[in-house]
């Protein structure tokens, strides 16, 4: 959406250079429907994740801290999703006022950064637990995990401030509708470039490189362990899970990041073609559905890698209350083999162990 400032008389009034861009009847039906599905599935799934981790598993492991915070971040975003569903169903007419516009926009941005940062920390934790289990034991503590999560929430909040400051309700004069949108007073403003690049680099590129590196090193360590322990049957599920984690993250966010970058070029006036604007504005909500639906499934995806998580999850569905005492490990299907190449262990000591655990 390319917007031009026209007048200001108490209400911020603007002109839309491409008033028909992204405004299609199927979008106004399909997107609210998808938002509703994401809301129901996300609220149900993430609420159960919070209950299982906090009440059944008693929040005793490093990874459980990250997964709990991941689910909480998703719930914060999901609570604002009905607003966006109504907004889209009303053909991009925002009826909720300026304050909710800022809050809902900040929630979307906050969830993006918090989720990505938490997944990145989870990948680093898995790398340390599997490749350097002994050396990292003193560093991988509950205190460190909780402090890390506090820092992540602060960083995500800081990264979301531009949405609070610059996202506002505007009245578009040439279409007679009120929208919740970013608007830059000058085409020469460096703000959209900064926000777009921050979202592309800090919200995707750097985290993806760290996640890719962490799981690649885990992959290599496990392959080396299998070569040493040739008598042990190879479990290819481990490698499929690693591949799924990396590809799941990549393909969830790449479409949204690409169209975010194109939207910045439109806002800057680099792209003037309304046909391209229409493609971008039409694709943007679809990429948001892909990214945030997968985002909201992440706690379930990572949680169900653990046998104990699945056990407690099924207990919860059967209304079986948690026991007074609970085991402290959240093991995963990847817990069949470990390799400690940097812990100076003798070859005789390199035995299969349940160290590919979310612990």
Swiss-Prot record:
Instruction: Summarize where angiotensin II binds, as residue positions.
Output: 15, 17, 167, 182-184, 199
Q: Where is the composition biased (Polar residues)?
A: 337-349
Q: Name one GO cellular component term.
A: basolateral plasma membrane
* GO biological process entries: angiotensin-activated signaling pathway; blood vessel development; brain renin-angiotensin system; calcium-mediated signaling; cell chemotaxis; cellular response to dexamethasone stimulus; dopamine biosynthetic process; drinking behavior
Primary location recorded for the protein, binned into one broad class: membrane
Q: How does it sit in the membrane?
A: Multi-pass membrane protein
Provide the effect of residue 239 to R/K. Answer: Increased angiotensin II-induced inositol phosphate response
Q: What is the lineage of its organism?
A: Eukaryota, Metazoa, Chordata, Craniata, Vertebrata
Q: Where are the transmembrane segments?
A: 26-55, 62-89, 99-125, 142-165, 191-216, 240-268, 279-304
Q: In which compartments does the protein localize?
A: Cell membrane
* Source organism of this protein record: Rattus norvegicus
Q: Where is this region: Disordered?
A: 337-359
Q: What does this protein do?
A: Receptor for angiotensin II, a vasoconstricting peptide, which acts as a key regulator of blood pressure and sodium retention by the kidney. The activated receptor in turn couples to G-alpha proteins G(q) (GNAQ, GNA11, GNA14 or GNA15) and thus activates phospholipase C and increases the cytosolic Ca(2+) concentrations, which in turn triggers cellular responses such as stimulation of protein kinase C.
Q: What name does UniProt use for this protein?
A: Type-1 angiotensin II receptor A
Q: Entry's SMART domains? A: 7TM_GPCR_Srsx
